[in-house]
Amino acid sequence: MTINLILLSLLAYVIGSIPSGLWIGKFFYKKDIREFGSGNLGATNSFRVLGIKAGSIVTVMDILKGTVATLLPFFFQLHVDHHFWLLTGAFAIIGHSFPLFAGFRGGKAVATSAGVILAYAPLLFVAALIIFLLTLKISKYVSLSSMIAALAALLISLFMGDWILIILIACITLFVVWRHRANITRIRNGEEPKIKWM
């Protein structure tokens, strides 16, 4: 059982390491998104550099990485406590943030983390998504909306009584805020780009 979990966690890391934005940019647009915009491999920079269509595809792919990785114990019929689903999900987040296939320079973990929550706690995902979209509609800042959605997910999870989930989301929230520290500075200075399509 332990060996199976280790193998699934490694597989989850590999799944998380798939650099969706980088590959779509290179294969279909002949662009390395690391050389444009914020230089980040995540969905937000994909929108900025490649456009709405490509950005949407990258977002869905990054979410699916987290969802598929979280459900690996289920897919492989590994009869373990459902909290172990969060373990494989966490490895996908690590893979997305430090991808094997992109020199360990990855995204900010927002979409892949959302995918983990979607697989484990769908209603929490829906609540966080609504908060994200409302904040985005008002502020036009993807970065700010991501951080607020992460904080909201943490607050909501406190009422769910699942301490493993709470701990993971707390770690995700801290990591997301830390990865957005440059964005926070730009927002304060009025230099953060706003979206124009919403």
Curated annotation (Swiss-Prot):
Under the heading InterPro entries, the entry gives:
G3P_acylTferase_PlsY
Pathway per the UniProt entry: Lipid metabolism; phospholipid metabolism
Protein name (record): Glycerol-3-phosphate acyltransferase
Look up keyword Membrane and say if it applies: yes
User: What is the protein's quaternary organization?
Assistant: Probably interacts with PlsX.
Q: Where is the signal peptide?
A: none
Known catalytic reactions: an acyl phosphate + sn-glycerol 3-phosphate = a 1-acyl-sn-glycero-3-phosphate + phosphate
Topology with respect to the bilayer: Multi-pass membrane protein
Q: Transmembrane ranges?
A: 5-25, 56-76, 84-104, 114-134, 158-178
Q: What is its EC number?
A: 2.3.1.275
Q: Where in the cell is it found?
A: Cell membrane
> What GO CC terms are in its UniProt record?
plasma membrane
